[in-house]
Amino acid sequence: MKLAVLGVCVSLWACAAAAGPGDALDEVMHSLAQRRHGEVSFVEQQFLSLLKRPVESYGELIYDAPNRLEKRTIEPRAETLVVDGETVTVQRGRRSHTLDLKAYPQLLPFVESIRATLAGDRAALERLFRLEFTGSEVRWTLDLRPLDAELAKTVADIRIEGSRDELSRVEIRQPDGDRSLMTLRAHSGR
């Protein structure tokens, strides 16, 4: 009898442990979904095999739920990239170029990795990636690995780190070893 009770306890503990990360991911996604607007500053470093030093840029990211994301690069040269629904607009100086995201499906995973995470849209992430979540709501890491074999030729994985409803780092690794690392910081006075 004691063995049966012990077996049930071990089984329940194993189920709880297995459900834990999923529950924490659901909590994080729920927290993220509650945030309707956010502004952070960013520093992005691109580590390219052709260069001895990383290429660094900085600026700010602005998010308006559920599907508007704006990246304003200040240095090394001013550039604004706006994703609004299915439209992507890039502006450099007086020149502006707009394209339909549907016409460039290879861009969708990059956009959705951040936009769907900020929106707390787990289903959108799961359509494109295999999700691995570690941590708790207080401090978490979400690894995204492409489900599509063609995409996997371009992106090895995307790692997003955060705390509660805030992202702190986004790292995109390519199969050839090149990678970009974006560090995010809340604006002061927030």
Annotated model-derived regions:
Residues 42, 69-73, 88-90, 142-144, ...:
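Short hydrophobic/aromatic-rich beta-strand segments that constitute the beta-sheet cores
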Residues 122-128, 135-190:
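Gly/Pro-enriched, hydrophobic low-complexity segments
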Residues 53-59, 157, 178:
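Amphipathic hydrophobic-ligand
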Residues 2-8:
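Sec-dependent signal peptide recognition
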Residues 20-48, 52-54, 92-147, 154:
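Flexible, processing/modification-adjacent segments and terminal tails
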Residues 60-112, 180:
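An acidic-aromatic
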Residues 49-50, 77-79, 149-151, 167:
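Short beta-strands and strand-coil junctions in structured, solvent-facing domains, enriched
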Residues 11-16:
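N-terminal signal peptide c-region/cleavage motif recognized by signal peptidases
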